[in-house]
UniProtKB/Swiss-Prot annotation:
<feature type="compositionally biased region" description="Low complexity">
    <location>
        <begin position="632"/>
        <end position="641"/>
    </location>
</feature>
<feature type="region of interest" description="Disordered">
    <location>
        <begin position="557"/>
        <end position="683"/>
    </location>
</feature>
<dbReference type="InterPro" id="IPR001878">
    <property type="entry name" value="Znf_CCHC"/>
</dbReference>
<feature type="region of interest" description="Disordered">
    <location>
        <begin position="936"/>
        <end position="986"/>
    </location>
</feature>
<protein>
    <recommendedName>
        <fullName>Zinc finger CCHC domain-containing protein 2</fullName>
    </recommendedName>
</protein>
<feature type="compositionally biased region" description="Polar residues">
    <location>
        <begin position="665"/>
        <end position="683"/>
    </location>
</feature>
<feature type="zinc finger region" description="CCHC-type">
    <location>
        <begin position="1131"/>
        <end position="1148"/>
    </location>
</feature>
<feature type="compositionally biased region" description="Basic and acidic residues">
    <location>
        <begin position="208"/>
        <end position="219"/>
    </location>
</feature>
<feature type="compositionally biased region" description="Pro residues">
    <location>
        <begin position="43"/>
        <end position="67"/>
    </location>
</feature>
<dbReference type="GO" id="GO:0035091">
    <property type="term" value="F:phosphatidylinositol binding"/>
</dbReference>
<keyword id="KW-0479">Metal-binding</keyword>
<dbReference type="InterPro" id="IPR036871">
    <property type="entry name" value="PX_dom_sf"/>
</dbReference>
<feature type="compositionally biased region" description="Gly residues">
    <location>
        <begin position="75"/>
        <end position="88"/>
    </location>
</feature>
<dbReference type="GO" id="GO:0005737">
    <property type="term" value="C:cytoplasm"/>
</dbReference>
<keyword id="KW-0862">Zinc</keyword>
<keyword id="KW-0863">Zinc-finger</keyword>
<feature type="region of interest" description="Disordered">
    <location>
        <begin position="1"/>
        <end position="90"/>
    </location>
</feature>
Length: 1178
């Protein structure tokens, strides 16, 4: 790390960083640490003044244990940080400070723990890159460390290493731990048994504590040149730049540092089991407490410190630059450095006191009713903090002061000042308010300043709201697991980036500005869901519009127009409920422009059907006026956990009980739906169970109210999480209601899993498209169509749980929508350029296009340039597959052309390639064939795109589409192969094996280009001849959290079992394997171009199996034809480059013999005497 900053040194030679001077003086090998480095629960002596010329306030030493780089005070404070405004030169200086702090100040244990915490914050691609860099750096010292690595990972017993007081024993244990493999559990178990018992270490410390004076003399003798060897043998002496005062007695500073390093490495090593690491972390905390404050603190596990967790294992550093519950902004963190541990903040607060409080200013944001007061607090340790308090907080604090801290004059002054703050905005006298408060705090007594109440009010981190960030590395891992289990989100790397910080925005009914509370998360996941309440007029406000941002808290935006829209919606609550329908429609038009975040639908108590309405069920989805990101690309990466919305309206419970009989009265119910999650949902449709609602229309023939004001719902147990909510139900086939045209509506694309029946969809005015599959379809025509994407066939388990019925009849409604007002460049055309009024029913297997860039659509525009998609989805007319039903009173308005796009698995493979247009015949609602229905199929090579209802682009690629014969298809043209292989937009392949009318499976058609099992894309690194519908797990096309279940049956192979390309495979046989669904959109797999190497072969590895069940494929047998990977092709020597053996078996001389690193073992002990029994190699 120091090597990285060397080019930056000559840039600013005259400005050495202020932090670097004193830590260098403190951390220089052999230096004596000052007494302020010792920190325990008792107040330490005051710190000594700085040695050099004064540069303003004493800059705080860097935080211990590597949990936060130092930030200079004064003018350079935060200059290189975001918002610091210091320019590039200031950023370079801050970078140099971090390098020097890391390399010169921290010891080995602190560096390792700090680096492990940083690695937990990296995403998978960054980790892979860092792994490559580490491999290159570690290769230089491989030959020197090879023997020690073999001993550490070998099967032989390393021998007796029980006496931790011997430097050679500690050295050998540290070397073994450093060279232990990450998966060698057996060797890790042996090392775990060899680690010193912490009780023995503590007992040794307690036994030698009474001989502290003699130990101190030995310490000083160990720092002399003559006593170096004696101190080395005794375990004393300087080490690692961290020298502690001799509180341990018998163990010197070097021995203490080595023991800390030993337990730190063991507690972080991945080869140890979880239980072992937790136990070792407890031992490490006990050891730190003993070295800090004596054995009596270690026996009670630091409980006198009252650190925010109940156990000492939770005693890890907080971020020293964190906002507290009152939005306190810490300019400097007044925490002295400790080389061994982190002192609790309670000890810090007891050790320092407030010397001066100054009111910096009074300000008001937006249309707030109250002021905010900013105070500058000077502490006794020369640190300065800036604390911002609201009027209510300041009023509560001042009125609750004890009598000994106030007087009659003080009380009168307080009341006068607070009355100014509570007046209306136009009646306030701001010039009078600020001087009163400034004089009040500047003339306060020492008893007032040193009071515990004043101290806790102005402290940097509140004891009430402080959630300890304990054990940074393990806490991050715990949070990752919890986020995966709660939300099953595919953005696992995003969840790790800002898991330390939750931004909770709390808006109140009175229009008070949002209070942003950045608090530390705790080890318990429930502590992060901090709820805040405010009482106004006796009514508890439960409106917690909180968005817990995991990745980008800065995207949590509350715009002014949404704020005003919320005020309008709230004002409509207090009006009379019996207002006309048209007036409510106007209110909805103003309030319906929602930009919500989607997550799972949390449904509560069971519902009771009363005619056409439902009563007393709360669909906990809440209002969406606060957005997290204005675009789908911003908000889809910010998942949120579902929350119970206990929102209360201003109505009484009796009024709510009476409000059960009319659908039109439900529009006044403020219990709106809350979405948290991914797309920008502006078009909202609701879902109801299909068996409990007789009709969705009211007496006027209209649909139900907008779902934002709709009645409540019950939990739908069999349905996976939807990204939109639809009014659903077993609607009678004769009830068909056309939807009104919105003002600026756009085409809607929806995911409808099979167990859901679509009966009616209501749109509201001023609504923008549903962000379901990314940008929705925009074709630029005057009338747009609604596409219901639903499948009567078994669909992949991404969309359907096991207990659902895959074949379900759907009722299809035709909607005409006005033209869009946005640019078609940012829209995805699901089935492009259809005639006006056309209606499409497609399977998710044929119409899903994953959007990797929701803002704009890269690559070829749609699947129309994809010959593979058209070969798998046949286009048939509805007059051949939908029987005419007599006696239907209500039908869909006659469309110009109606088509159904179904996978070829549901069609016959031997029908003539003809198209069947449906010229405006009535379509019965809810009649679609099931899986084994006898239907006709047409080839997608039909040259009549107008009559078949498909676009021009679909009909212009006949060479790439298979014919009606079940034989292999002709190879596509090179241009088409290139376009389909390189396009990311059409990576959803629906090539399936055909199924005839009797249900027998026809052999699948061979295709020239399709999804590859090696890389997941359509490439040339392997054949995909026997591609089948359910043989491949595609990435989730929707970025939201869906409940993923394993496949219905075991899956065959889709690619040969090696990276050899087509030229190296003789007969096309393949090795079956199971490819589980990866949690990321594109798994990190090997580069497919490696398949061009003749001797390269690698068996396809199983995917990410940490959170998903992995089932092995049956009949996994190796190829006997010789086309599979050769045995000698799996291993290669990186030393000589020849295949067939590993590097450790290589007979050639090393290629890097002349470039070996100069690193030598740091902890190698001195040469033992001749009569010593230790191995000379150690």
């Amino acid at each position: 790390m120091l090597r990285m900053k060397l080019p930056l040194k000559p840039t600013h030679p005259a400005e050495p960083p202020p932090e670097a001077e004193e830590p260098e003086a403190d951390a220089r090998p052999g230096a004596k640490a000052p007494s302020r480095r010792r920190r325990d629960c008792r107040p330490p002596p005051p710190p000594p003044p700085p040695a050099g010329p004064s540069r303003g306030p004493l800059p705080p030493p860097p935080p211990p244990r590597g949990l936060g780089p130092p930030v200079a005070g004064g003018a350079a404070a935060g200059a290189g940080m975001p918002g610091g405004g210091g320019g590039p030169s200031a950023a370079l200086r801050e970078q140099e400070r971090v390098y020097e702090w890391f390399g010169l100040v921290l010891g080995s244990a602190q560096r390792l723990e700090f680096m492990c915490g940083l690695l937990d914050l990296c995403n998978p691609l960054e980790l892979r890159f860092l792994g490559s860099c580490l491999e290159d750096l570690a290769r230089k010292d491989y030959h020197y460390l090879r023997d020690s690595e073999a001993k550490a990972n070998g099967l032989s017993d390393p021998g007796p290493l029980a006496d931790f007081r011997e430097p050679a024993v500690r050295s050998r244990l540290i070397v073994y731990l450093a060279l232990l493999g990450s998966e060698n559990r057996e060797a890790a178990g042996r090392l775990h048994r060899l680690l010193p018992q912490v009780d023995s270490v503590l007992k040794s410390l307690r036994a030698a504590r009474g001989e502290g004076s003699r130990g101190g003399a030995e310490d000083e003798r160990g720092e002399d040149g003559d006593g170096e060897q004696d101190a080395e043998k005794d375990g004393s002496g300087p080490e690692g730049g961290i020298v502690e005062p001799r509180v341990g007695g018998g163990l010197g500073s070097r021995a203490q540092e080595e023991l800390l390093l030993l337990f730190t490495m063991a507690s972080l090593h991945p080869a140890f089991s979880f239980h072992q690491r937790v136990t070792l972390r407890e031992h490490l905390e006990r050891l730190r407490a003993a070295l800090r404050g004596g054995p009596e603190d270690a026996e009670v596990e630091v409980e006198p410190c009252k650190f925010a967790g109940p156990r000492a294992q939770n005693n890890s550093a907080h971020g020293d630059y964190m906002q507290n519950n009152e939005s306190s902004l810490i300019e400097q963190a007044p925490i002295p450095q400790d080389g061994l541990t982190v002192a609790p903040h309670r000890a810090q607060r007891e050790a320092v006191h407030i010397e001066k409080i100054m009111l910096k200013g009074v300000q008001r944001k937006r249309a707030d009713k109250y002021w905010e007061y900013t105070f500058k607090v000077n502490w006794s340790d020369l640190s300065v903090t800036t604390v911002t308090k609201t009027h209510q907080e300041l009023q509560e604090f001042l009125l609750k002061l004890p009598k000994e801290l106030s007087s009659e004059t003080f009380d009168k002054t307080i009341l006068r000042a607070l009355n100014q703050g509570s007046l209306k905005r136009e009646e306030r006298r701001h010039p009078d308010l600020e001087p009163i408060l400034r004089q009040l705090f500047s003339s306060s007594s020492q008893a007032f300043l040193q009071s515990q109440k004043v101290h806790s009010f102005f402290q940097s981190i509140s004891s009430d709201s402080l959630h300890s960030i304990n054990n940074l590395q393990s806490s991050l891992k715990t949070s990752k697991i919890l986020e995966h289990l709660k939300e099953d989100s595919s953005e696992a790397s995003s969840q790790e980036e800002d898991v330390l910080q939750h931004a909770i925005i709390h808006k109140k009914h009175t229009g008070k500005s949002p209070i942003v509370n950045n608090i530390g998360t705790s080890c318990s996941p429930l502590d992060g869901l901090t709820m805040q309440y405010s009482e106004q007029n006796g009514i508890v406000d439960w409106r917690k519009q909180s968005c817990t941002t995991i990745q980008h808290p800065e995207h949590c935006v509350t715009s002014a127009d949404q704020h005003s829209a919320e005020k309008r919606s709230l004002s409509s609550i207090n009006k009379k409920k019996g207002k006309p329908q048209t007036e409510k429609e106007k209110i909805k038009k103003t309030d319906n422009r929602l930009n919500s975040r989607i997550n799972g639908i949390r449904l509560s108590t069971p519902q009771h059907a009363h005619g056409g309405t439902v009563k007393d069920v709360n669909l906990d989805i809440g209002s969406g006026h606060d957005t997290c990101g204005e675009t789908s690309s911003e908000s889809y990466s910010s998942p949120s956990s579902p929350r119970h919305d206990g929102r209360e309206s201003f109505e009484s419970e009796e009024e709510k009980d009476r409000d059960t009989d009319s659908n039109s009265e439900d529009s006044g119910n403020p219990s709106t739906t809350r979405f948290t999650g991914y797309g920008s949902v502006n078009q909202t449709v609701t879902v109801k169970p299909p068996v409990q609602i007789a009709s969705l229309g009211n007496e006027n023939g209209n649909l139900l109210e907008d779902p934002l004001n709709s009645p409540k719902y019950q939990h739908i147990s069999f349905m996976p999480t939807l990204h939109c909510v639809m009014h659903n139900g077993a609607q009678k086939s004769e009830v068909v209601v056309p939807a009104p045209k919105p003002a600026d509506g756009k085409t809607i694309g929806m995911l409808v899993p099979s167990p859901v029946a679509i009966s009616a969809i209501r749109e509201s005015a001023n609504s923008t498209p549903v962000g379901i599959l990314g940008p929705t379809a925009c074709t630029g025509e005057s009338e747009k169509h609604l596409e219901l994407l639903a499948s009567p066939l078994p669909i992949p388990s991404t969309f359907l749980p096991h207990s659902s019925t895959p074949a379900l009849h759907l009722t299809v409604q035709r909607l005409k929508l006005p033209p869009p007002q946005g640019s078609s460049e940012s829209c995805t055309v699901n089935i492009p350029q259809q005639p006006p009024g056309s209606l499409s029913i497609a399977s998710p297997n044929t119409a899903f296009i994953p959007i990797h860039n929701p803002g704009s659509f890269p690559g070829s525009p749609v699947a129309t340039t994809d010959p593979i998609t058209k070969s798998a989805s046949q286009v048939v007319g509805l007059n051949q597959m939908v029987p005419q039903i007599e006696g239907n009173t209500g039908t869909v308005p006659q469309p110009t052309n109606v088509k159904v796009v179904l996978p070829a698995a549901g069609l016959s493979a031997a029908q003539p390639p003809a198209s069947y247009p449906l010229p405006g015949s009535p379509l019965a609602a809810g009649v679609l064939p099931s899986q084994n229905s006898s239907v006709l199929s047409t080839a997608a090579t039909s040259p009549q795109p107008a009559s078949a209802g498909i676009s021009q682009a679909q009909a212009t690629v006949p060479p790439a589409v298979p014919t009606h014969t079940p034989g292999p298809a002709p190879s596509p043209s090179p241009a088409l192969t290139h376009s389909t292989a390189q396009s990311d937009s059409t990576s959803y392949i629906s090539a399936v094996g055909n199924t005839n009318a009797n249900g027998t499976v026809v052999p699948p058609q061979q295709m020239g280009s399709g999804p590859c099992g090696s890389c997941g894309r359509r490439c040339s690194c392997g054949t995909n001849g026997n591609l089948q519908l359910n043989s491949y797990y595609y990435p989730n096309p929707m970025p939201g959290p869906m409940y993923r279940v394993p496949s219905f049956f075991t899956l065959p192979s889709i690619c040969n079992g090696s990276y050899l390309n087509q030229a190296h495979q003789s007969n096309g046989n393949q090795l079956p394997f199971f490819l589980p669904q990866t949690p990321y959109a594109n798994g990190l797999v090997h580069d497919p171009v490696m398949g061009s190497q003749a001797n390269y072969g690698m068996q396809q590895m199983a995917g990410f199996g940490r959170f998903y069940p992995v089932y092995p494929a049956p009949n996994v047998v190796a190829n006997t034809s010789g086309s599979g990977p050769k045995k000698n092709g799996n291993v290669s020597c990186y030393n000589c480059g020849v295949s067939g053996h590993y590097a450790q078996d290589c007979k050639q001389s090393s290629m890097e013999a002349n470039q070996q690193g100069t690193y030598r073992l740091r902890y190698a002990p001195p040469l033992p005497p001749s009569n010593d029994t230790l191995d000379s190699a150690d």
